[in-house]
């Protein structure tokens, strides 16, 4: 999942000596390392699945512990991602105000912070939730840091497709936190998030593809035309909507979720096809309106998972 960061073009962050790093600013910098806005979306997909697994209101203490563990785990992954990507972050407009680039946090501090969060989150999950959730959480962190950030991101245009698996695991964690087991319901929702991730991220990549091209990151919009990217977005979008409708036939949800999934999915497909039509017409610049789909993708996943949480009470 993705949050947009920006700065005036051409402004490069500069290192700061310890004496010029106020305590309050330092605290904010460490919080920024965790990418809170992204984690909000991850938790939006975790908590509703707990309602689905419980078929009602789950234990609130369990929800709190799962949210705290999830935040720490995702925060650790994000901090380690920033540590690894600090070289290219300094060259990209949208990331050059990150704490490592500005010097508000040193690389060693960031590395220690990320590893500490990873360890604490795993132990918290294991001792207060269950060890299945702990291993899933650790697996998500390692997949994001090692497989996506270190291996895929700078090597293949399919980076976000397979790297996005890390962002799909919170639905499994939400289910396992309640049941200490797996079922087809979280697997289906894993599929929804898997096919959601590329058409969520590619519109943003279309907007900032010059940034990625500058640092040699082969995002699909960097190496392919807008027509090709838009066609891929439409394909993934259709599969995502179809997968989202599998819960009711298998008996996991009722009419309410299905109605919301159809309505929200229909709006998504409208936006996706609109982007494809503009790309086919070779519209460029602001008229391409690629960010409309990016913003709608966040609304879509929020509405869909809210429906998952509400549906058990209407059956």
UniProtKB/Swiss-Prot annotation:
Transmembrane residue ranges: 38-58, 62-82, 111-131, 132-152, 159-179, 184-204, 233-253, 255-275, 293-313
Organism superkingdom: Bacteria
Topology within the bilayer: Multi-pass membrane protein
Pfam family, one: UbiA
EC code: 2.5.1.141
InterPro entries in the record: Protohaem_IX_farnesylTrfase (IPR006369), UbiA_prenyltransferase (IPR000537), UbiA_prenylTrfase_CS (IPR030470), UbiA_sf (IPR044878)
Gene3D superfamilies in the cross-refs: UbiA prenyltransferase (1.10.357.140)
General function of this protein: Converts heme B (protoheme IX) to heme O by substitution of the vinyl group on carbon 2 of heme B porphyrin ring with a hydroxyethyl farnesyl side group.
UniProt name for this protein: Protoheme IX farnesyltransferase
Organism: Streptomyces coelicolor (strain ATCC BAA-471 / A3(2) / M145)
